[in-house]
């Protein structure tokens, strides 16, 4: 079986690394020693789980042998059958655990996140829902122990946002938010509606892993940086100094604007973070498109134009269309209670990846 062969191969590699780490020539080479140590550490839990799995198989074989030798001893046979049932359950759990450990890890999972929320169809109502979603993610971040900071925003007169960009910092931020990319649809009676009719609006969410400098090098010659006075809702000037920053990446035409800070330097630093994340995301999207076939069964396509979720206020309903999950607890979700949705999406994604793994893909 392909999975067993993979586990045996990893066990052999673990033993090799153990020998390398005991070799004085490796110890004297700090770079190689660090690389081997990390690989050894990553393999340690997998190998330990595989050894435990083999031990259960051995116990099961011994129990079968005991059952065969029990003869007419009813008490012995009953005891062996009970032990066998317990071991079979343990084996099943062990197998699931091993399969999950073998799933390729997303290298972005522990990264910070650039969160971008933009109003789509629906005008002012869509802009207000941008504000609602930002509040939801802020409370979810608080529950998870993450820090959220607004980097840039474009406010409207009624308190909504045409666009909002924020940084979410904390362990597992990308892992917890990566399934949020896509179109979020809201159905409710807008505050501006006098006839009591339900309107449908849409908001687009993009979740980008923060780019490390080592992953992405941007040449100064590829940037055009413009500074100007920041403006508020309606276009009125809110600052008397040239603190707003617009950075254009000339090779791609990507433009990032930051004006929320009073300091030009802070706005520039924030704009660079957003630009780096967008460029890294563009690289990864291009790479992902080459692996599109392998991603078909996974949760959503990650396509920003994909409608992923509907928030229906009259029915207090949240529906995630990718996994056909419906919850009648809209208020709880908007208060940051996203865990149930995220857990269901994660489980679905893992199940589809396990199906590929089991098929030897």
Swiss-Prot record:
Question: Out of the domains of life, which is the source?
Answer: Bacteria
Subcellular compartments: Cytoplasm
* Matches recorded under Pfam families: PCRF (PF03462), RF-1 (PF00472)
Q: Which modifications occur after translation, per UniProt?
A: Methylated by PrmC. Methylation increases the termination efficiency of RF1.
Which parts of this chain are annotated as the region Disordered? 286-306
Give residues where N5-methylglutamine occurs.
Answer: 236
**Listed GO cellular component terms?**
cytoplasm
Keywords attached to this entry: Cytoplasm, Methylation, Protein biosynthesis
State one molecular function term (GO): translation release factor activity, codon specific
The parts of the chain that form a coiled coil are: none
Q: What biological function has been recorded for the protein in this entry?
A: Peptide chain release factor 1 directs the termination of translation in response to the peptide chain termination codons UAG and UAA.
The entry's family comment says: Belongs to the prokaryotic/mitochondrial release factor family.
What name does UniProt use for this protein? Peptide chain release factor 1
According to its UniProt entry, this protein's organism is Magnetococcus marinus (strain ATCC BAA-1437 / JCM 17883 / MC-1)
């Amino acid at each position: 079986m392909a999975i067993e062969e993979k586990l045996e191969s990893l066990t052999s590699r673990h033993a090799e690394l153990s020998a390398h780490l005991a070799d004085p020539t490796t110890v004297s080479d700090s770079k190689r020693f660090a690389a081997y140590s990390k690989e050894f550490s990553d393999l340690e839990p997998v190998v330990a789980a595989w050894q435990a799995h083999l031990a259960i198989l051995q116990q099961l074989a011994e129990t079968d042998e005991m059952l065969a030798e029990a003869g007419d001893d009813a008490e012995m046979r009953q005891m062996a059958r009970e032990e066998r049932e317990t071991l079979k359950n343990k084996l099943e759990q062990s197998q699931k655990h091993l399969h999950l450990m073998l799933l390729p890890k997303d290298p972005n999972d522990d990264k910070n996140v650039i969160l971008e929320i933009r109003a789509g169809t629906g005008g002012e109502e869509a802009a207000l829902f941008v504000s609602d979603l930002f509040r939801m993610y802020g409370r979810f971040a608080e529950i998870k122990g993450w820090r959220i900071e607004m980097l840039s925003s474009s406010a409207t007169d009624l308190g909504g946002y045409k666009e909002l960009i924020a940084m979410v910092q904390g362990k597992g931020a990308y892992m917890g938010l990566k399934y949020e990319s896509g179109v979020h649809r809201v159905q409710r009676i807008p505050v501006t509606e006098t006839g009591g009719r339900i309107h449908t609006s849409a908001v687009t969410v993009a979740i980008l892993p923060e780019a490390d400098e080592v992953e992405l090098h941007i040449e100064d010659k590829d940037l055009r940086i413009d500074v100007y006075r920041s403006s508020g809702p309606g276009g009125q000037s809110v600052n008397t100094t040239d603190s707003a920053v617009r950075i254009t990446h000339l090779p791609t035409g990507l433009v990032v604007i930051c004006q929320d800070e009073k300091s030009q330097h802070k706005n520039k630093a924030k704009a660079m973070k957003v630009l780096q994340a967008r460029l890294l995301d563009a690289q990864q999207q291009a790479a992902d498109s080459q692996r599109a076939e392998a991603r078909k069964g996974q949760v959503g396509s990650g396509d920003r134009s994909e409608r992923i979720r509907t928030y229906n206020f009259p029915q207090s309903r949240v529906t995630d269309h990718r996994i056909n999950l419906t919850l009648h607890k809209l208020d709880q979700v908007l208060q940051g209670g996203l865990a149930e949705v995220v857990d269901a999406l994660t489980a679905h994604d893992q199940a589809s990846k396990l199906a590929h793994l089991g098929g030897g893909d």
